[in-house]
């Protein structure tokens, strides 16, 4: 089993004959919730199977999957940011719903073949269940995590206008084409233009900005929990160790700009609803500020739980939705 570690940036201790599942991503060991949720169910079932976080570099994904295809004890598992789109080209089969959404968050191994599925769509439907009719919706981000959220929103709010904030307009156009979005939508690349639009009724953050996790890039670290999606993260300054005060001090100017952008955004904007698909922390900086200004907020916990239940069912061939949900929530 030690051979698995050749492809990872973290070290896993898995017994030689133990069946296991993985959550594959850049740094799932730094805060992914799925291992805790899945392992609660495995323990309740008195199973020896466990889920582990697999931190993988982009250039090692193909090698890892080739190894897992021939790894008899690997069952499948989850895929998290930022590989939900990239990983598709290395899989043998893609479920038709995942193909339409254009991203994969679940892998199932059958014999020596790996198949991709997407359960984020079900999670997205759960996340927006309490959100009522909307006139104009602002979507922040257009990555793999955004796709199922956008699909569920455009299906529920068919008469709403959508504003996409993303620096790459072609990415949005391709996404709209692939998801067959019929809604009226605009693309805004400039943050200043977003700050000047007054009549949003719902703001949805599908980016990872706000997530509490130390990320390593070129031997240096940064954490996105201190920022909102209104930050210019191109200017972020990294540090050599997980020193929170040092990181904040080094990014004073960026944090100040972020604060000014937030203040401008919330000025004269009452009664906006905010959905942030991030679940760690429960209240991101964006949600805390939105709540402070008296707006209704929703986090990504329900979305994350629902997708985890559905993924567990697919990988482990189980139909016990209520049992799995109960064990994931109650830890017993």
Annotate each language-model stretch with its function.
Residues 25, 118-121, 128-129, 134-156, ...:
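Glycine-rich adenosine-cofactor-binding loop
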Residues 29-30, 169-170, 281:
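Helix N-cap at the beta1-alpha1 junction of Rossmann-like dinucleotide-binding domains, i.e.
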Residues 183-297:
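Rossmann-like adenosine-cofactor binding region
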Residues 1, 7, 44, 300-332:
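C-terminal helix-to-coil terminal segments
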Residues 2-132:
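Phosphate/diphosphate ligand-binding glycine-rich loop within oxidoreductases
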Residues 155-161, 292-296:
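Conserved S-adenosyl-L-methionine
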Residues 79-86, 144-145, 207-212, 280, ...:
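Short glycine-rich anion-binding loops that position phosphate/pyrophosphate groups of nucleotides
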Residues 126, 275, 279-286, 293-318:
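Active-site capping/gating segments
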């Amino acid at each position: 089993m030690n051979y698995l570690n050749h492809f990872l940036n973290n070290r896993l201790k898995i017994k030689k004959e133990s069946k296991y599942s993985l959550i594959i991503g850049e740094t799932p060991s730094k805060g992914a919730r799925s291992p805790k949720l899945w392992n609660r169910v495995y323990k309740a079932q008195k199973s020896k199977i466990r889920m582990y976080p697999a931190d993988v570099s982009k250039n090692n994904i193909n090698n890892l999957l080739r190894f897992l295809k021939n790894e008899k004890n690997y069952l499948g598992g989850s895929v998290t940011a930022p590989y939900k789109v990239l990983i598709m080209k290395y899989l043998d089969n893609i479920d038709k719903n995942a193909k339409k959404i254009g991203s994969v968050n679940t892998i199932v191994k059958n014999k020596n073949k790996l198949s991709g599925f997407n359960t984020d769509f079900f999670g997205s439907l759960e996340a927006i269940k309490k959100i009522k009719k909307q006139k104009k919706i602002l979507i922040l981000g257009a990555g793999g995590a955004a796709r199922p959220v956008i699909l569920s929103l455009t299906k529920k709010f068919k008469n709403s206008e959508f504003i996409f904030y993303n620096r790459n307009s072609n990415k949005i156009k391709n996404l709209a084409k692939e998801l067959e979005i019929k809604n009226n939508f605009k693309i805004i690349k400039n943050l200043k233009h977003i700050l000047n639009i007054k009549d949003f009724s719902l703001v949805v953050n599908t980016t990872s900005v706000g997530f509490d996790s130390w990320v390593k890039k070129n031997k240096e670290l940064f954490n996105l929990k201190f920022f909102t999606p209104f930050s210019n993260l191109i200017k972020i300054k990294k540090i050599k160790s997980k020193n929170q005060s040092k990181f904040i001090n080094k990014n004073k100017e960026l944090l100040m700009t972020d604060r000014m952008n937030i203040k401008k955004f919330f000025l004269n904007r009452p009664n906006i609803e905010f959905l942030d698909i991030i679940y760690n922390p429960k209240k991101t900086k964006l949600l805390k500020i939105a709540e402070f200004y008296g707006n209704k907020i929703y986090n990504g916990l329900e979305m994350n739980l629902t997708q985890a239940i559905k993924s567990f069912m697919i990988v482990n061939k189980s139909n016990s939705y209520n049992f799995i949900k109960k064990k994931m929530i109650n830890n017993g």
